[in-house]
Amino acid sequence: MNPNDYLVLSAILFAIGIVGFLTRRNALVAFMSVELMLNAANLALVTFAHVHGSLDGQVGAFFVMIVAAAEVVVGLAIIVTIFRSRRTTSVDDTNLLKF
C-alpha cells in the first residue's frame, strides 16, 4: 500500500472516533472513541516515520501507547466505580457533584 493510503485510513479512523465521541452519550463508547483516535494518531506517526526513514515516529507511537495503556487503567476504573454507584454509564445521567 501507498503511504497516502495509510494516512487516509488514519484520517478516517480519527474522524470516526470524533463522531463517536461527540454523538454517543455512553461513557464506554466515548472512551473507546478516544482510544480509536489515539490509534489513528499512532498510525499516522508510524507512517510518517516510515516515509522519512526515521524511528522518531515509531518512538512517539510507543510513548502514545504507554499513555493510552495508563489511560485505559484509570478510565475503566472510574467508569466501573461510577457504574457501581449509579448503575448507569450514561454521561447525561451521571452528576458527580451530587452524592
Swiss-Prot record:
EC identifiers of the protein: 7.1.1.-
Gene3D superfamilies per the UniProt record, alphabetical: 1.10.287.3510
Catalyzed reaction equations: a quinone + NADH + 5 H(+)(in) = a quinol + NAD(+) + 4 H(+)(out)
Membrane topology reported for the UniProt record: Multi-pass membrane protein
CC annotations in GO: NADH dehydrogenase complex; plasma membrane
Compartments reported by the entry: Cell membrane
Keywords, comma-separated and alphabetical: Cell membrane, Membrane, NAD, Quinone, Translocase, Transmembrane, Transmembrane helix, Transport
A Pfam cross-reference name: Oxidored_q2
PANTHER family, A to Z: NADH DEHYDROGENASE SUBUNIT 4L-RELATED (PTHR11434:SF21), NADH-UBIQUINONE OXIDOREDUCTASE SUBUNIT ND4L (PTHR11434)
Assigned protein family: Belongs to the complex I subunit 4L family.
Name this polypeptide is given: NADH-quinone oxidoreductase subunit K
Protein species of origin: Cutibacterium acnes (strain DSM 16379 / KPA171202)
Lineage per the UniProt record: Bacteria, Bacillati, Actinomycetota, Actinomycetes, Propionibacteriales
